[in-house]
Amino acid sequence: MHQRILILDYGSQVTQLIARRVREAGVYSEIHAGDVDDAFVRDQVAQGLKGIILSGSHASAYEEGSMRVPAAVFEVGVPVLGICYGMQSMAQQLGGTVSFSDHREFGYAEVRAHGHTKLLDGLADFTTDEGHGMLKVWMSHGDKVTELPPGFKLMASTASCPIAGMADEDRGFYAVQFHPEVTHTVQGKAMLARFVKDICGCEGDWNMPDYISEAVARIREQVGSDEVILGLSGGVDSLVAAALIHRAIGDQLTCVFVDHGLLRLDEGKQVMQTFAENMGVKIVHVDATSQFMGKLTGVADPEAKRKIIGREFVEVFQDEAGKLQGAKWLAQGTIYPDVIESAGAKTGKATSIKSHHNVGGLPDTLNLQLLEPLRELFKDEVRELGVALGLPPQMVYRHPFPGPGLGVRILGEVKHEYAELLRRADAIFIEELRNAKDPASGLTWYELTSQAFAVFLPVKSVGVMGDGRTYEYVVALRAVQTFDFMTADWAPLPHPLLARVSSRIINEVRGINRVVYDVSSKPPATIEWE
């Protein structure tokens, strides 16, 4: 059994990032609801648990009905790290004081480390003129600790949060008000690695080859001799899911590629060629363009569009499954960011942002059980898994594409005309990103961006072409850089590149006369517009 860290989830949107950072340190981690009982915690320790991390939350630590940390967490003798709400709960339950703050902190902050603790000693992003080591971190809190519990010492502070970190090193208890799990906290990865390795004593015995072996064994045990049907979207997630399942059960898997009329330019042909040449998997191509477009007519609300697309996918799969003798499982390439944004995480505590067409809630009429082998993985882990499975890098590192396709990149009602314009504009954008190199890194801008696409805006603007007046549509370009897709920054594309893309779209795509560039980060914006 792997050495492991238990993460107790209190509802933060980024709880799974904690698990990701722990795994990057080569240590296996599991997430469980924060309200597990004492017996569960003691049983975990009896099985060799090395440490516990308490997540953040959107709730208040002193709000009536807020979850409390199981008392056993502080009694079983393993190191504990509290993050944000986890820090406040630790302080409150161990005799400190938590108060509502008039100065709420959301975003970038600079933290001063104190006391030379094992967690923060020697970590600094810059040094002040007075010689104090400072950390660049990400804050997201309203409440704050105003009095340390007995036995604790000050570990960190900010200008507006005098107690931004605390530690009782005799018991191995550490807590920080900021979020070390997000990439905006520059030393966060090092902090978490230091906690699980130096403080908890984990050696780092978890890796992708082990994960593949364990996942293959789980799939075989779960599926047995049953037939499995998997829906291909053309994206990385369903591709890797197909490769993993195929390794586990071979010809028991049949892939169904549904063309809903909302794919990228020539994507249907590319998917069929790619899967036939590289995977040797049974694949069925279904052209359901008329079915999907008909159902979307007159629908403008993004949630309604997603749900319609999800429902139609289910209907198509049900039809195809009925043609397969023995098909009892529907496999999907659902990954964790899909789950967390739908508040479908297994702990069920996160706040919903948007629904995803391939998350939870399959109707009973489908009569298929759900197989989601990538449900606990982030996008970067999925890519790592794909390479380890032997898939071509050019397939694995393709930019992600949402299951609803262009349906959520056309704002408002989806029309065939809009889809055709967007397809061509998007293809030009991606082509130029692939052709343009950054001289500093030698990489193309397609490689330097994590996701890039065009968005169709159903509004018209006045323009001039030749000697004539035009009144045509607008497209927005979106390009982001991110490590885990839970947070993202807009990509600083060179102005000459943006100018070239704009010129080509306006001149080559009749019906578009204005191009704009989206400079919003996540948060507060999501990566997709809908």
From Swiss-Prot:
Residues the record lists as binding ATP: 233-239
An example molecular function term from Gene Ontology annotations: ATP binding
UniProt domain GMPS ATP-PPase: residue ranges: 206-398
UniProt-listed Enzyme Commission number(s): 6.3.5.2
CDD domains: GATase1_GMP_Synthase, GMP_synthase_C
This protein's GO CC annotations: cytosol
Alphabetical UniProt keywords: ATP-binding, Glutamine amidotransferase, GMP biosynthesis, Ligase, Nucleotide-binding, Purine biosynthesis
Highest taxon of the lineage: Bacteria
Active-site residues (renumbered): 84, 179, 181
Keyword ATP-binding: yes
Reactions the enzyme catalyzes: XMP + L-glutamine + ATP + H2O = GMP + L-glutamate + AMP + diphosphate + 2 H(+)
Annotated ranges, domain Glutamine amidotransferase type-1: 4-205
Leading EC class: ligase
Functional pathway: Purine metabolism; GMP biosynthesis; GMP from XMP (L-Gln route): step 1/1
Subunit structure: Homodimer.
Alphabetized NCBIfam families for the sequence: guaA_Cterm, guaA_Nterm, PRK00074.1
UniProt function note: Catalyzes the synthesis of GMP from XMP.
Name of the molecule in the record: GMP synthase [glutamine-hydrolyzing]
Lineage, top ranks: Bacteria, Pseudomonadati, Pseudomonadota, Betaproteobacteria, Burkholderiales
